[in-house]
Structures are given as C-alpha cells and as structure tokens.
Amino acid sequence: MFKFQKEQEIVNIAGVKIGGQPGELPTVLAGTIFYDKHEIVKDVARGLFDRDAAEKLINLQESSAEETGNPYIIHIFGTTPESITRYIDFVAEISEAPFLIDSPEGTVRSHAAEYVSEIGLADKAIYNSINMSINASEIEALALSDIDSSIILGFNAMDSSLQGRMEMLENGAGLLEEGLLSIADRCGIVNKLIDPSITPMGNGAGVALKMTITAKAKWGHPTGSGIHNAPSAWNWLNKKKEKDPVLYKICDVGSTCLQQAAAGDFILYGPIEYAPYIFPMAAMSDIMISEAVADLGIEPASRHPLNLLV
C-alpha cells in the first residue's frame, strides 16, 4: 500500500467524514432507493411508494453502518420534480443522514437543489452530479442554491482514457469552455467528491480505478465511484444471472473491494437492499488496508472497522 504525498482533504457533510489517506477513515457507502424499477415505488411520476418498506430499507442500511462503522449516505433517485420532492421529504423525516439527489434529468436536479435550499436541508444534500452535460440553466440553479457538496463526474464521452477524464475535470477536454472543477467553484461547491465514472467492462472500466489514485494524487479531493455498474453492465455476467443469481451478486458486491484497494473514499453501491452484504465486505477491505498502511504513520479513526470488529 501507499501514502499520498499530496495532503488529502477530509470533508464533513452533515457529520459524515469522507476522504483522507488510505486506511485513515472507513469507506462511506451510499445505497440507492427509489431507483428505476424499484419494487417499492408504485407511481414513478408522482413519487408514490410503500412507506413502510422504504423505512425498513433505510433502517437496514443504518443498522449495517452502526455494526461495521462505515458511515452511510442515502442515494435518492427521482425522475420528476414531484417524485424527487416526495422522496426528499420522506428521507429527511426518517433519517438524519446526508443524501444524494440524483436524476437523469437536469431540470429535476435543479428543482431538487432549489427545494432543499427552501426547506433548510441543503447542508445534508449532495448534488449528483456536475458532469459534461451540465448546461447554463442547471449551473445557475446550483449556484443560486445553498448546496455546497457535489459529485463531480469525470465522464468524457469522446475520450474515456485517463487523460480524457482528467482533462474533463481540469479544462473541459476541448468539449467545454472550462473544466468541471472550475464550474463547481462557480456553483459554490466546497465539498468536491470526484467520481472517475464507471464505463462498461471492455470500454475502460478499469481506468476508473487508475483515475481514483491519479485524481487524489493531483488534487487531494475525496474520490469514489459506483463501481458496481461495471459488473452489472457486463453482458457475460448478465447471461449467467438467470441461472445463478448468487454468482451475479458476488461479482456486484465484490467490486466494492476493487474501488477501496484503489484508494476510494466512498462507494455508490447500488440497490440499498444490498446493505447487509456490502457493509461487511467494505469493512473487511478497510481493515486490511488499514493494517497495510500501519507502518506509514496512518492512524485509523476511532470508529474504523479495525477498532470495532477485530
């Protein structure tokens, strides 16, 4: 293992600390709720859902976090302003944890940014994400909001190489007038969480691991990803899924360890139902990484899995 020469930033979002040197802080884990085709959602457009089932899932993630010491974030996914508003209200009612506001639609993300600012929850909200498709109206909405935490996505549709992704953050890679980090500054983002973006296996999925290390070495910001998207989009594995769903789950959950070994600080692990599997897996990796850097002068946090489970 290794220690970065660059000072590593630790951000604090609603009490959850993210970042630092490998082995210093436990990996922060974010499970997604209300995702596409989530069985608890009854009306996608209006955001109607089974409240009891949703509460149980949120509590499931919380209890997993309490046991292993890995902090958690609730990843809210919505497709309309009405739905994401309902989801935010519910999550804030049930949990004190920070939450990601995520949507494939920029207008929905913009609405969510405005809404959390209006109701006084901007300090708990993490915008997902500032990326190459962001337009002037979305930038304006985010800048006018009170949100100061955001994921910054290193996806480059024209060049998925390490250089292409790094340049997207640094200078716009010739596709934007400025880099995404500069846009984040203009939007008032203080807590920058870099996501190298997970592309399909065979199309640069592994580059994200290299970029995690490279980005932390260059900028020192907390870095992580939704690495499970690589195995979940793997055609070969999906053909095996119907016959052996356990095999699929092993690969999906196991990908967590790869991102951690590449110095990842946070992981968007997908369906929140996977919490009972993800948290022990992440805790195991955190313990081994912390032991591996012990001779480099890196002390684990008091509630690190190394201090709770060994």
From Swiss-Prot:
Pfam families given in the database record: MtrH
Claim: GTP-binding is one of the keywords in the record: no
Keywords linked to the UniProt accession: Methyltransferase, Transferase
Gene Ontology terms, MF aspect: methyltransferase activity
SUPFAM superfamilies: Dihydropteroate synthetase-like
Enzyme class: transferase
EC number from the UniProt entry: 2.1.1.-
Similarity comment text for this entry: Belongs to the MtrH family.
Protein name: Putative methyltransferase mtx subunit H
Complex formation: May be part of a complex composed of 3 subunits; MtxA, MtxH and MtxX.
InterPro entries: Dihydropteroate_synth-like_sf, MeTrfase_MtrH/MtxH, MtrH
Any single GO BP term: methylation
